[in-house]
Amino acid sequence: SGPAEDHAARLVETKAVIEEAMRLYPPVASMSRQAVGPDDLAGKRIRKGSLVVVSQWVLHRHRLLWEKPDCFDPRRFLPGSREKIDRFAYLPFGAGPRVCIGASFSLQEAAIVLAHIMRSFSLELKKNHVAMPVQHITLRPEGGLPMILRRRGNRFTAPGAAAGVHPSG
């Protein structure tokens, strides 16, 4: 493993921030599956061949599954807390045989990229901009997300440290 992989393994808090962002704003807001046989789901009869839609948007904000579900709290995904999350309560990359094969890679890549950005810049949402999520193929902010980037003075800060996201270890 090279330096990038070693840093990625230590970016626990950065990954927690990304995962919490994906909980509130899942890349794909819903997924569908076809029932391979008859079943009962929450007291409703599902016939073979029926299309069942699971909304990650609703699932990730469900009050029975998440404490303060509308609050951004990356601590949910830190070691010690993450293990308490029901395995079917958090599905940003889907689940089962059709789970996104790039899930692990994309999370690692996002953590490395975010750490490098935060090491060099501070980011601020443009004043008075309200981010409105819209579903296309993926969930995204309508009209983009206009940000103000400011170069940080100390270019040698540890990845993520200036943003309050510190590598563990």
PLM regions: where:
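Conserved cytochrome P450 K-helix E-x-x-R motif and the immediately C-terminal K′/meander segment
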Residues: 2-42
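C-terminal domain-closing interface element
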Residues: 14, 20-23, 30, 143-169
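Conserved cytochrome P450 K-helix/beta-meander segment immediately N-terminal to the heme-binding cysteine loop
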Residues: 54-82, 158, 164
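Active-site-adjacent bridging/hinge elements
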Residues: 81-90
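Cytochrome P450 heme-binding "Cys pocket" and the immediately downstream C-terminal segment
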Residues: 103-139
